[in-house]
């Protein structure tokens, strides 16, 4: 069964979802049939073909009337503000990827269902009313056929949860604090402007900017047994892509660097293969650009003092997350 997918909102995540689909070998279980975005179609085609972060698309993108042609495939292009008025039923859309950042609650995202879509995945942390928050590889098995609107969590939660899962299963995570050293994103500013958050008011290109994140606490939505045990904050830094999670936690028993690294190596080679990668080389952030894994554990940075453990993982906050959107779409459509 081929899942028909539509993308609503063609920004960083929307474009990378499309590129990941084609660059990953074009999955035969999924077909992108439509894109809805208020931007000019020719401009969006150009931005798909040429990307500052991920380079030139290794294929062909052109505009054909009311559609894109991507490697010969025709993808309908729409420009409708109200999701309820989109022709999802006419196009046979199984799953809408809601990538605008505007419809992040079940109530708002359900407008796509009124348009005829069967399911919706929000590409951001969802409201409390969503049917599930999913980190593929960690808890996608909880999906049910009755789920209609789900959240794909955040890029940082998608990095953190695969790191925490095997550690909690083998060592027990009593509690922990996380810092994500995060590349700047489009919700920041190039030069100082008025903002209610005085740190967010400052130039993204000139400073390290501490700010809040719900990524650590959201692990409790994915692994309920850890609800309330994790917290943290973000430091936005002047790099365009790739971020680093730094997690310190108290284990339920004493451990060693060797045991911690062994646990995560086994997970990366086993149940989390393709989701969690394992690195032993002395690399820097740019080396993980365009890496499709959700999380790359860096074994060279592990520190242990009795029950106090520090682990670190790199993640391409655009590319890894976009690949998981595709995985989650297929899992949601096939949920029983």
Curated annotation (Swiss-Prot):
Statement: the UniProt record of this protein carries the keyword Phosphoprotein: no
Q: What class of enzyme is it?
A: oxidoreductase
Report whether Manganese shows up as a keyword of the record: no
Q: Which InterPro entries match?
A: GlycerAld/Erythrose_P_DH, GlycerAld_3-P_DH_AS, GlycerAld_3-P_DH_cat, GlycerAld_3-P_DH_NAD(P)-bd, Glyceraldehyde-3-P_DH_1, NAD(P)-bd_dom_sf
Q: Which domain of life is it from?
A: Bacteria
Q: Which GO molecular function annotation, any one, does this entry have?
A: glyceraldehyde-3-phosphate dehydrogenase (NAD+) (phosphorylating) activity
Q: Which PROSITE patterns match?
A: GAPDH
Binding site residues for NAD(+): 12-13, 37, 81, 123, 186, 317
User: Which residues carry out catalysis?
Assistant: 155 (nucleophile)
Question: EC number(s) on record?
Answer: 1.2.1.12
Q: What is this protein called?
A: Glyceraldehyde-3-phosphate dehydrogenase, plasmid
- This protein's gene is called cbbGP
């Amino acid at each position: 069964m081929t899942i028909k997918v539509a993308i609503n909102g063609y920004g960083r995540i929307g474009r990378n979802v499309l590129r990941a689909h084609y660059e990953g070998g074009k999955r035969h279980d999924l077909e992108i049939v439509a894109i809805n975005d208020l931007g000019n179609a020719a401009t969006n085609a150009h931005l798909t073909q040429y990307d500052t972060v991920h380079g030139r698309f290794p294929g062909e993108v052109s505009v054909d009337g009311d559609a894109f042609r991507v490697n010969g495939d025709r993808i309908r292009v729409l420009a409708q503000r109200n999701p309820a008025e989109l022709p999802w039923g006419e196009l046979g859309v199984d799953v809408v990827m809601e990538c605008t950042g505007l419809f992040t609650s079940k109530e708002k995202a359900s407008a796509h269902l009124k348009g005829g879509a069967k399911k919706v995945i929000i590409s951001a942390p969802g409201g409390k009313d969503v049917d599930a928050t999913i980190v593929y590889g960690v808890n996608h098995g909880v999906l049910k056929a009755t789920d209609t609107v789900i959240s794909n969590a955040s890029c940082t939660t998608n990095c953190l949860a695969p790191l925490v899962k095997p550690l909690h299963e083998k060592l027990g995570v009593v509690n922990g604090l996380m810092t994500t050293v995060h590349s700047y994103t489009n919700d920041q500013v190039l030069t100082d402007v008025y903002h209610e958050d005085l740190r967010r008011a400052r130039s993204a290109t000139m400073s390290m900017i501490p700010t809040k994140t719900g990524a650590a606490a959201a692990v409790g939505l994915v692994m309920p047994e850890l609800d309330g045990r994790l917290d943290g904050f973000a430091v936005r830094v002047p790099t365009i892509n790739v971020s680093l999670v730094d997690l310190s936690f108290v284990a339920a028993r004493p451990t060693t660097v060797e045991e911690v690294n062994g646990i995560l190596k086994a997970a990366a080679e086993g149940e989390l293969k393709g989701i969690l990668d394992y690195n032993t080389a002395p690399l820097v952030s740019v080396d993980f650009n365009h890496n499709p894994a959700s999380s790359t554990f860096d074994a060279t940075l592990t520190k242990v003092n009795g029950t106090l453990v520090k682990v670190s993982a790199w993640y391409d906050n655009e590319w890894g997350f976009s690949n998981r959107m595709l995985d989650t779409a297929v899992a949601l459509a096939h949920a029983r």
